[in-house]
């Protein structure tokens, strides 16, 4: 079973999480931010990952450190759960329509960090959540898997819908990338023989 328990503690955040890549989409999430909770629950549900996550952060400042550090911790958890990435599909992509919004998420578990965030929201906040914290979250994930992540928005007016499409789409794309390739279970999916 590809399951990891992880703690990450700094002066800004204290994070505990359990991630199971081969789960059923069950989640218990408490980040101190209602909107971020909602996004992570959608990510877990649509990726079919089991995720238990608590974060106590300096939310009296804002949600920047909370979002960034959860992204870092989640990326580290994926890296540990995947190990040397033997037998995985490696790539995944998904177009996610959410009402009027349409976003593509594409993933390469390449061992190299790239985030292309081509997402353009028309408001700076959803509730009290700063929209720019969404890209900080995904940059934390990308740096710590490490992985290449592309988010490309094709349509959308409502900021909530656009970000929801990003998180749901990422769940689907990552689920495809971490899926085991039964025909090549013992192989690392790279001509180099390793993913770095």
Describe each PLM feature range.
Residues 1-196:
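N-terminal intrinsically disordered, cationic/polar leader segments
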């Amino acid at each position: 079973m590809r399951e990891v328990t992880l703690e990450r503690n700094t002066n800004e955040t204290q994070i505990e999480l359990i991630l199971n890549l081969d789960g059923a989409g069950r989640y218990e999430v408490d980040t101190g931010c209602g909107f971020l909770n909602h996004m992570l629950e959608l990510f877990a549900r649509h990726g079919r990952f089991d995720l238990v996550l608590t974060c106590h952060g300096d939310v009296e400042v804002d949600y920047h450190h909370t979002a960034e550090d959860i992204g870092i911790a989640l990326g580290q958890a994926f890296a540990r759960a995947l190990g040397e990435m033997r037998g995985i599909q490696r790539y995944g992509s998904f177009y996610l329509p959410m009402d009027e919004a349409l976003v593509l998420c594409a993933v390469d578990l390449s061992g190299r960090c790239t985030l292309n965030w081509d997402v353009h929201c028309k408001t700076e906040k959803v509730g009290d959540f700063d929209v720019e914290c969404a890209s900080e979250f995904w940059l934390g994930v990308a740096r710590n898997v490490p992985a290449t992540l592309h988010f490309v928005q094709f349509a959308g007016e409502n900021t909530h819908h656009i970000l929801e499409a990003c998180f749901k789409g990422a769940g689907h794309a990552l689920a495809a990338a971490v899926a085991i390739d039964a025909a090549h279970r013992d192989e690392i999916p790279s001509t180099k023989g390793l993913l770095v």
